[in-house]
């Protein structure tokens, strides 16, 4: 039951726009901003004027790096009802996957944009899976219908076959490629023909005879798909009755929110065709904050969970999903308010860090301009100035409440690293500050300093990711830096179970030191990370020393015996030990834990793990043999091939260490006619002969 206080939420939509790089996502967002009246002229990505791409590098490169959040308003066509649409434009480049993860976590619905000449591309698949993981309902937009090779059918087939989803086309294109002149609305059975370039003059008409049979067949399929999720419609369908437009819209909405069907629309954002109808579909089919399951939080030290319904009068629950350094106001924390109301000037409790923090000013964002507000209510997205400690994925609740944690954000491990040093010694400190600020904004970017060599290394998700961060260091923090060649972020692990002990005893006059632990270490499945278990019985290791022993073990994991890389995928069980009434201390047990772990890894048949990338190369048939031969020579495992138009897509798993400089080699092999995408898939053991070579380096 919706209360009066919640009624504004019925007309709220929090959506993300996500796709493969170059599918036309930012252009689609720009058009939405133009038609909702947030911008007075249309920003084109290819002339570097896009409003949403507000970082300098984004405008130069024509790709979206940070997820900009914008509030826009839209009146549903043919009605006076105004809707608030919060849009997050997410990057399509694989190196920026964390941005997509973050935005998926705080959305209620998404628009997946596909290039209709390419169908479902690899990054679109990744984004779709992320949306599946976070349970985000979505609609699909088959963009670029005017492009050579455009095919609405290709997109529908790919959604079914590559994504395993049920597409429900609610529109049909009137012609494609150069003949694309309008869109047929299958739900309302009307044709929309565009008569000017800006897409603002639309003539609505009956469906032309040439499309009548095809559209009638598609409408019958749409009603059948909608009837599967709506009992009332099913009864009408079985009795041969024709549903009204309202009944059909209501059933499609229900199926979309339950993630059983995925409405598919078509258009050309660049040519301004189909964008207003896309906005109508966002309003018609994607959920309001009241229609998605209420977020749950886990109560500290218990299995209990608490529900936070979307209600501005409820208890405050918010999630910080992005940190940004702003040249004018300092640190901006982007938040999604799930429940309650956040007031400027109030105090909040950061449950993730167990710290109290003060809210300064509150902003609603429009790409790179902002509007100051006094409060953010349940269902809203905004930015906070003044929070000192909040990080990505932190839970913010009302000051003084019990500690409750919302589900955080999955942060992938970086796979590539490089050494970095300032060009002048004078910039050393400035570089340190700049890198630290960049790492605060981006949890997939790590900065490490080697105490012995004094060398600083940075690690991230790919070459482009690190290149852009080094570029930002220069632009935003005025630090010129030299970087080394990219290196692979290896990991180490054990391959057999061992029992070991760590004993730290020091007697040198006065009070001594005594710590003693016995542990069992065993290998885990790849990707399982590290698991610690305390199974001490009878107090042989007192409770107050378990934590320090665990800390020592975890610190020792940071550097393995073979190459000094972190040790992963193992379980350590602390099962026994002994202590001394006087000499035992937290420090002694921490050292004992660390000693035990180092010995366990030495004795546990250690192995080196390397990141394996999922690579897809799109190549004309004539060059396919060369590409496959080359991937095999890079220790690649070919997973399969798939025809796409007159090209082939070769899919393979290839170690990252073999992929440096691949773009250049691929272009020269195919005279520039192939393209590829690559993203991290899993870690795998390095063959023995290569492990020996790595250790000699």
From Swiss-Prot:
Chief place of localization: cytoplasm
SUPFAM superfamilies: EF-G C-terminal domain-like (SSF54980), P-loop containing nucleoside triphosphate hydrolases (SSF52540), Ribosomal protein S5 domain 2-like (SSF54211), Translation proteins (SSF50447)
Transmembrane segments: none
Residues given in the record as GTP binding sites: 19-26, 89-93, 143-146
A cellular-component GO term for this protein: cytoplasm
GO molecular function per UniProt: GTP binding; GTPase activity; translation elongation factor activity
N-terminal signal peptide: none
Swiss-Prot/TrEMBL GO biological process terms: ribosome disassembly
PROSITE patterns: G_TR_1, G_TR_2
Residues in tr-type G domain copies: 10-290
Locations listed in the record: Cytoplasm
UniProt entry keywords in alphabetical sequence: Cytoplasm, Elongation factor, GTP-binding, Nucleotide-binding, Protein biosynthesis
Gene3D superfamilies according to UniProt: 3.30.230.10, 3.30.70.240, Elongation Factor G (Translational Gtpase), domain 3, P-loop containing nucleotide triphosphate hydrolases, Translation factors
Function: Catalyzes the GTP-dependent ribosomal translocation step during translation elongation. During this step, the ribosome changes from the pre-translocational (PRE) to the post-translocational (POST) state as the newly formed A-site-bound peptidyl-tRNA and P-site-bound deacylated tRNA move to the P and E sites, respectively. Catalyzes the coordinated movement of the two tRNA molecules, the mRNA and conformational changes in the ribosome.
Stored HAMAP family: EF_G_EF_2_B
Family: Belongs to the TRAFAC class translation factor GTPase superfamily. Classic translation factor GTPase family. EF-G/EF-2 subfamily.
Identification of the protein by name: Elongation factor G
Organism (species): Deinococcus deserti (strain DSM 17065 / CIP 109153 / LMG 22923 / VCD115)
């Amino acid at each position: 039951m919706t209360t009066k206080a919640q009624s504004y939420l019925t007309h709220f939509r929090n959506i993300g726009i996500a796709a493969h790089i170059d599918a036309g996502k930012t252009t689609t967002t720009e058009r939405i901003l133009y038609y909702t009246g947030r911008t007075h002229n249309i920003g084109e990505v290819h002339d570097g004027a896009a409003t949403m791409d507000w970082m300098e590098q984004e405008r130069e490169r024509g790709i979206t790096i940070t997820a900009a959040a914008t509030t826009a308003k839209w009146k549903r066509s043919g009605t006076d009802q105004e809707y608030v649409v919060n849009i997050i434009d997410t990057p399509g480049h694989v190196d920026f996957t964390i941005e997509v993860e973050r935005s998926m976590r705080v959305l209620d619905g998404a628009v997946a944009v596909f290039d209709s000449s390419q169908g479902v591309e690899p990054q679109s698949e990744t984004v779709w899976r992320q949306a599946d993981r976070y349970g985000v309902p979505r609609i699909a937009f088959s963009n670029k219908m005017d492009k050579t090779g455009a095919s609405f059918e290709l997109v529908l087939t790919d959604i079914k076959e590559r994504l395993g989803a049920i597409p429900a086309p609610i529109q049909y294109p009137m012609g494609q490629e150069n003949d694309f002149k309008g869109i047929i609305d299958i739900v309302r059975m009307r044709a929309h023909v565009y008569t000017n370039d800006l897409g603002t003059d639309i003539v609505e008409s009956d469906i032309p005879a040439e499309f009548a049979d095809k559209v009638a067949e598609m409408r019958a399929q749409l009603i059948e798909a909608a009837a599967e999720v709506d009992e009332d419609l099913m009864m009408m369908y079985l009795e041969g009755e024709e549903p009204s437009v309202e009944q059909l819209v209501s059933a499609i909405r229900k199926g979309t929110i339950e993630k059983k069907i995925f409405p598919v629309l078509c258009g050309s954002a660049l040519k301004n065709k189909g964008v207003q109808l896309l906005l109508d579909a966002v309003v018609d089919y994607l959920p309001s904050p009241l229609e998605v399951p209420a977020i749950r939080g886990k109560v500290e030290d218990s299995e209990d969970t608490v529900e936070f319904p979307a209600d501005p009068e409820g208890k405050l629950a918010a999630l910080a999903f992005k940190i940004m350094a702003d040249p004018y106001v300092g640190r901006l924390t982007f938040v999604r308010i799930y429940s309650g109301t956040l007031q400027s000037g109030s105090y909040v409790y950061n449950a993730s860090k167990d710290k109290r923090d003060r809210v300064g000013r509150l902003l609603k964002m429009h790409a790179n301009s902002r509007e100051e507000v006094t409060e953010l209510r349940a269902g809203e997205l905004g930015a906070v100035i003044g929070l000192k400690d909040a990080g990505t994925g932190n839970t913010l609740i009302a000051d003084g409440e019990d500690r409750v944690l919302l589900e955080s954000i999955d942060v992938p491990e970086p796979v590539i690293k490089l050494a970095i040093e300032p060009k002048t010694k004078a910039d050393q400190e400035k570089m340190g500050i700049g890198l630290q600020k960049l790492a605060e904004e981006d949890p997939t970017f790590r900065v490490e300093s080697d105490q012995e060599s004094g060398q600083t290394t940075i690690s991230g998700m790919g070459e482009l990711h690190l290149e852009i961060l080094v570029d930002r260091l220069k632009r935003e923090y005025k630090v010129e830096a030299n970087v080394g060649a990219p290196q692979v972020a290896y990991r180490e692990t054990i391959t057999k179970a061992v029992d070991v002990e760590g004993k730290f005893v020091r007697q040198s006059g006065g009070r001594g030191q005594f710590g003693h632990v016995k542990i069992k270490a065993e290998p885990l499945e790849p990707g399982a990370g590290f698991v610690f278990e305390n199974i001490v019985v009878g107090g042989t290791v007192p409770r107050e020393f378990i934590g320090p022993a665990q800390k020592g073990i975890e610190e020792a994991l940071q550097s393995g015996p073979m190459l000094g890389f972190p040790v992963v995928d193992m379980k350590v069980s602390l099962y026994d030990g002994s202590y001394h009434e006087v000499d035992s201390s937290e420090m002694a047990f921490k050292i004992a834990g660390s000693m035990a772990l180092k010995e366990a890894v030495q004795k546990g048949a250690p192995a080196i793990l390397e990141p394996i990338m999922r690579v897809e190369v799109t190549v004309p048939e004539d060059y396919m043999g060369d590409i496959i031969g080359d991937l095999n020579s890079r220790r690649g495992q070919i997973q399969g091939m798939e025809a796409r138009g007159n090209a082939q897509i070769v899919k393979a798993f290839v170690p990252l260490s073999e992929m440096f400089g691949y773009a250049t080699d691929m272009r020269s092999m195919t005279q520039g006619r192939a393209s590829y995408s690559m993203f991290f898939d899993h870690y795998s053991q390095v063959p023995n002969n290569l492990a020996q070579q790595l250790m000699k380096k």
